[in-house]
Amino acid sequence: MKKLILIPALILLMTAGCTKTVKEEITPVADSQLPASSEQQVPVVDKVSEQSKQVSEINLVSQYSQAVLKTNLGNITVKFYGSESPKTVENFLKLAQTGFYDGVRFHRVMKDFMIQGGDPNSKDDDWSNDGIGGPGYKFEDEFNNHKLVAGSLAMANAGPNTNGSQFFIVTAKETPWLDGKHTNFGYVVDGMDVVKKIEALPTNQND
């Protein structure tokens, strides 16, 4: 399977105690290009700009098992629960492949809880509508037996079966009140220190 590189050219605006966090772009890397260990540099291919129709014809879950979020604070590598939450992983990968996540930021940062991104509204400097954007559709929850703990990659939602594009990475040791309410579709395998750096950034009242 291949690894997908999310290239959050993470732009951090640290002004007056406020933070506009992560920007993302995505590029696929074939299995033959994967590093032997997480310590090696993952090669980056040219930015992908495929049309949605082309991507929709491809089963991306069978091709990509991981993704790398590249930020200006370092890289975050996540591994997917592709066999347990296939629809969620497929949705994430298709949005990534079509460039939907390009320029999106981690718009919500809550210390000792989580960092959240994936909202297209966060691409600009208008804070007022961050957190309410999406891809224009919603899809059902896809729960599994994995608990939401530190490092978990999960879908943000506004209630049952309202998944779209927003996701979050858990920083708390455990979050039992979220289990069975948010689809857990992966986990951080490298770069949790980067997640912690993002979590430590100053925020504003929107967080």
Which residue ranges define each predicted feature?
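Cyclophilin-like peptidyl-prolyl cis-trans isomerases
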Residues: 7-8, 17-207
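Repetitive helical segments and hydrophobic/amphipathic motifs
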Residues: 11-12
